[in-house]
Amino acid sequence: MKLVVGLGNPGKQYEATKHNIGFMVIDAIADSVSHTPWREEQKAEVCSINVAGEKVLLVKPQTFMNASGESIGPLMRYYKIDPSDVYCIYDDMDLPVGKLRIRPNGSSGGHNGIKSLISHIGTENFPRFRVGIGRPLPQWTVIDHVLAPFSEENQEKVQKGIKDTVKAVLGTLELGIDKGMNQFNPKRRPQR
């Protein structure tokens, strides 16, 4: 069994914010495949899908971003899931809007939701699907940026990014993290 976790904040007022790109991807995955009804479990909204014969839980923690680990840690322990089987989808300001980067592990990079996960599961060794939200405007704080909706001119990039991430998550669930990174991470141009 695997957990696919999308990070975000609960509540209507946060639905369309950049910080909720993880929730948006989870909803898009659920919309693209057959799934069980959503239910509340361990401070999260959870449903099940099947990928290549394996049960996968789609998870949207309802604890607010900075406390996401309070939901994921107990879910992992209840279902006896190894950290390497927890795929986490979240926003990344260091990537351009809609761009995807898959990593097998790593530090929090200053992301408070990831800090909470690391704290509650006790390791940095879980796969991440980082979805770009771009940098704040010069006059904006980081909080202003992540809690604002995407601009109208970025909507096409956002929708493409969500679609690409859905494809990458489902593909990586079938292929494994190493093959998934090879197939779905952007290819680097050779140095000349």
Where are these regions (language model features)?
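Conserved TIR/SEFIR loop-to-helix hotspot centered on a Trp-containing motif
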Residues: 108
